[in-house]
Regions:
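Active-site beta-strand/loop architecture of penicillin-binding DD-peptidases
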Residues: 1-30, 36, 45, 53-158
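Extended, non-catalytic substrate-recognition/exosite surfaces adjacent to catalytic cores, especially
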Residues: 30-32, 171-172
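Betabetaalpha-Me/HNH-type nuclease active-site subdomain
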Residues: 50
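Short, highly charged C-terminal tails/helix-capping segments
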Residues: 159-175
Length: 175
C-alpha cells in the first residue's frame, strides 16, 4: 500500500522500497501515470485532511492546527479506510481501520501507514458531527494516531508538516 501511494503522489513513478538510502537511478522504476495526474491526486489527498474524513483528527484535536487568521496549517494528505472483517461465511462486527498519510504533500518525502485491528470507538469525546461505525472509523482513530506520529517525527526529520500554504504551492486549488 505504501509503494502504491508513493507512486500516486511522486509524479507517477514506482519506487523500489529500501531500508537504506539508494541513488535516484536505483530507486525509480517505471512511470505508471503522469505528473499532472499525480498533482491532482495530491490535491485530492490534501482535501481528505482539510475538509474530509480525516478533518477531525487534523484540526479539532490538534494543537494550533490553524493560524490566527484561520488558515489551515497541516501540509499532509491522506486517505482513510474502514471495513468490516470477514470470517468464513460473512462479515463480522469487528473492523479494520487504516489511514495512509503523505507529507509534505506538496513535495512528498514520507508515507505513514497506520492500520488498527478492531479499534474501540471514541464515544462522543469530540461532539457529534456524525456517528459512523459507532465512532470507530478510520477518521476517528487511525488518522488521529497518524497525526500524533507526524507531530512527533516532523521536528526529528526536519520537515515542515505544518505550514501556511502560499501562491507558490504546486497544488492547484481551482480544480
Amino acid at each position: 500500500m505504501a509503494v502504491a501511494t508513493s507512486a500516486v503522489v511522486n509524479g507517477g513513478y514506482l519506487i523500489k522500497p529500501s531500508l537504506t538510502k539508494l541513488g535516484d537511478d536505483k530507486r525509480y522504476e517505471n512511470q505508471i501515470f503522469s505528473e499532472e495526474t499525480s498533482e491532482i491526486m495530491r490535491y485530492l489527498l490534501s482535501q481528505v485532511v482539510a475538509k474530509g474524513t480525516a478533518k477531525e483528527a487534523f484540526n479539532k484535536d490538534a494543537d494550533k492546527a490553524y493560524t490566527e487568521d484561520g488558515k489551515f496549517k497541516y501540509l499532509v494528505g491522506g486517505k482513510t479506510g474502514t471495513s468490516h472483517k470477514i470470517d468464513k461465511k460473512s462479515y463480522t462486527r469487528e473492523k479494520l481501520t487504516t489511514f495512509i498519510s503523505v507529507l509534505p504533500i506538496h513535495k512528498p518525502k514520507y508515507v505513514v501507514l497506520i492500520s488498527l485491528d478492531d479499534p474501540k470507538g471514541i464515544n462522543r469525546e469530540y461532539g457529534e458531527p456524525y456517528n459512523t461505525w459507532n465512532w470507530s472509523d478510520a477518521g476517528w482513530n487511525a488518522a488521529r494516531v497518524s497525526r500524533q506520529i507526524i507531530d512527533r517525527v516532523s521536528p526529528i526529520l526536519d520537515i515542515k508538516a505544518r505550514y501556511i500554504p502560499n501562491e507558490n504551492m504546486l497544488i492547484n486549488t481551482s480544480l
